[in-house]
Design a protein with these regions (language model features):
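Cleavable N-terminal export/targeting peptides
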Residues: 1-30
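Transmembrane beta-barrel domains of Gram-negative outer membranes and organellar outer membranes
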Residues: 21-274
Length: 274
């Protein structure tokens, strides 16, 4: 945990020093972020898959996860939060710890872990210049969860994200590896592979299907695989003001593998890009 906090402090300190060294950094914030967003495709962020695009928004998710005993766990916020574009080709995400209500008197409710994500856009072209994107992520979580609602150690997650559009159709995906900083053989590594396939039916209607897979190495689920098929629908972007918009939607996760911790899970998501 201390190592993760030190890394985060160093990143913030570096960004702050660089920022204040530039005249008009904050005065030019929206001009800079708008220019960054103009250089990439204008798809919407999928329901579950993290988009390779750079976004600047506030996001809230709500999840309902059903286990084999028929008990529903309510996940408030889903670990989402504030997304900013502080530099060209760079996005920083500060995620609020989710609050987890197990609806089970034998399991204590509480907040999950705090997490952060940095995106660096490697390649991109908007709809007039190829309609594609390739982005590298570095995510890390800090074990701030109460009781058993978080991990025992910090987890570092490098990820590669990609996307390509073909007219009104687009595909976005990520492949990442979650690596605990300690007790790796006991906790295990996770390999997550997510792909979303969207079709822009009309101006503000985006139906989609996602395939969300997790592969486990070491730990209690060694050798297992969990895959969900997630049909979803997104509506937006609706302009609330000259600067602020709104996109919302939801999805329904259906387990497609023999092993699955939950099934028939509901997801609601709302975002306010600015």
């Amino acid at each position: 945990m201390r190592r993760s906090l030190n890394v985060f402090v160093l990143v913030v300190a570096f960004c702050s020093t660089t920022a204040f060294a530039q005249d008009g950094y904050f005065a030019n914030w929206f001009e800079r972020s708008d220019r960054s967003k103009a250089d990439q495709p204008h798809w919407v962020t999928p329901v579950a898959t993290v988009t390779p695009r750079l976004e600047q928004e506030v996001r809230y998710d709500q999840q309902w996860q059903h286990n084999a005993e028929g008990v529903t766990t309510d996940n408030y916020d889903g670990g989402k939060g504030l997304e900013l574009i502080p530099f060209h080709n760079v996005e920083v995400i500060f995620n609020v710890p989710p609050y987890i209500d197990h609806n089970n008197p034998k399991v204590k409710n509480g907040f999950g872990d705090t997490s952060f994500l940095v995106k660096y856009r490697l390649l991109s072209g908007n709809e007039e210049h190829g309609n594609y994107i390739l982005t590298a992520f570095l995510g890390w979580s800090v074990p701030t969860g109460s009781y058993t609602n978080g991990a025992k150690h910090a987890v570092i997650t490098p990820t590669i994200a990609y996307g390509k559009g073909f007219g009104k159709f687009d595909a976005q995906g990520t492949f990442g590896v979650g690596m605990p900083i300690a007790d790796t053989t006991k906790i295990g590594r996770t390999y997550t592979w997510n792909n979303a396939f969207q079709y822009h039916v009309i101006r503000k209607l985006w139906p989609e299907v996602e395939i969300n897979s997790t592969f486990y190495q070491d730990g209690p689920h060694d050798g297992m695989k969990q895959t969900f098929i997630t049909p979803g629908l997104l509506l937006g972007r609706f302009q609330l003001s000259r600067r602020v918009g709104m996109t919302f939607g939801g999805g329904f996760q259906i387990a497609a593998t023999h092993y699955h911790g939950t099934n028939h899970n509901g997801i609601f998501t709302i975002r306010f890009p600015f």
